Amino acid sequence: QRYALINGIIAPFRAPKSAKVYKQLWTERGSPLLFHGLDLQKKLQAALGNGYHVAFGMRYQSPSIKSALEELQEQSVDRIIVLPLFPQYASASTGSVQDKVMDIVKDWWVIPSINFISSFCDDPGFIKAFAELGKQHMAQDNYDHVIFSYHGLPERQVLKGSDKGYCQLGACCNTYNKRNKYCYRASCFATSRLLAAELGLREDQYTVTFQSRLLKDP
């Protein structure tokens, strides 16, 4: 059903418009997603040193997750740490990467220890880095209000991310704890609160929103 929706309805209508928009994002180095990813790989490798081997792979593009894992396999590593670059956990994003990794390594004769970093939405280093970017933009102009906009998810997926009966799509997201640590909505609000604090924003100076081209999808 998802395949038919994306390939039969969404892609044919969206592709021409998307291609025009993405072309505007291209630089002399090519795709920002690719070269920023490779830059991150190199910087992380330099920071970790020769005791680690950092590989970079993407879920739907090249280099692929499969090629990254094969690169690590050739190094005969004892342990693999998988870090999907999604700050907030969602089954459709982070979970999809985890599923892909396990689907690939299940065919290996020797499977090393594998650890997943499922979320880093409240990591101090992440918050500080993003806040620094925000400060640079805010210093260029006076903003009356800041909007934190996140990719939207169907409510049915959000409800599955918390302990049964805990998520009410409301006040339950005012705190971030072990009962809702995998709730995408609660994670986004947690990130926003921490960023707002780092940026010196009062509660009435920012808004958290969710956007999707599919409009309402329960």
Predicted segment positions?
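Active-site-proximal alpha-helix that buttresses catalytic centers in soluble enzyme cores
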Residues: 1-218
